[in-house]
């Protein structure tokens, strides 16, 4: 299977499409969940996602160091779903923000996100598995009103661009419909 990046807005059908692609492959799947259950609502979302996955799929729940942990847990899986980069980048922020999330060490966060995505890119190139990576498109919204929000948007945008360069296909989800972005349907793009 190819390496695929699926991006789009919140609740646009990204995870469902990723699972559909993996299911249709008929291969063994390792599902990598990056969410941390910080409150009841998030715990409920995580549980909904767990129930939506086939029982035969292996699950790795990891909030950071994803690229290091996948090779340890891949086993015989031929497909790896990572859901999602959005939360992975957010988890990197959590390590360096103060308790009120008002101050952040920008250099350390940038370094951590760069390291995290670099390890993931290396993992993708090293393993003989197809990767289906889910992320959010946050660049189409309003400019965040604070420094942390703008930094998050910028770093997630850079992470998405790096991953898009590494994969064979990129899809943008709109209202549950996948739009192929890469390879482009336009010559030379």
Residue spans for each PLM region:
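Conserved P-loop
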Residues: 2-74
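Structural motif
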Residues: 5, 81, 132-134
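Short, well-ordered beta-strand core segments
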Residues: 29, 80, 169-172
């Amino acid at each position: 299977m190819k390496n695929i990046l699926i991006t789009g807005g919140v609740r646009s059908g990204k995870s469902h499409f990723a699972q559909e692609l993996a299911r249709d492959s008929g291969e063994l799947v390792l599902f990598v969940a990056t969410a941390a259950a910080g409150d009841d609502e998030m715990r409920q979302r995580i549980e909904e996602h767990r129930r939506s996955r086939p029982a035969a799929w292996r699950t790795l729940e990891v909030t950071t160091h994803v690229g290091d942990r996948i090779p340890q847990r891949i086993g015989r899986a031929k497909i790896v779903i990572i859901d999602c980069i959005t939360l992975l980048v957010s988890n990197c922020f959590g390590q360096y923000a103060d308790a009120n999330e008002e101050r952040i060490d920008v250099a350390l966060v940038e370094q951590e996100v760069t390291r995290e995505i670099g390890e993931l890119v290396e993992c993708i190139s090293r393993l003989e598995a197809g990767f289906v990576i889910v992320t959010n498109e946050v660049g189409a919204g309003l400019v965040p009103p604070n420094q942390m929000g703008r930094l998050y948007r910028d770093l997630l945008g850079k992470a998405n661009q790096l991953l898009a360069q590494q994969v064979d296909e990129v899809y943008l989800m709109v209202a549950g419909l996948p739009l192929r972005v890469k390879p482009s349907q336009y010559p030379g793009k």
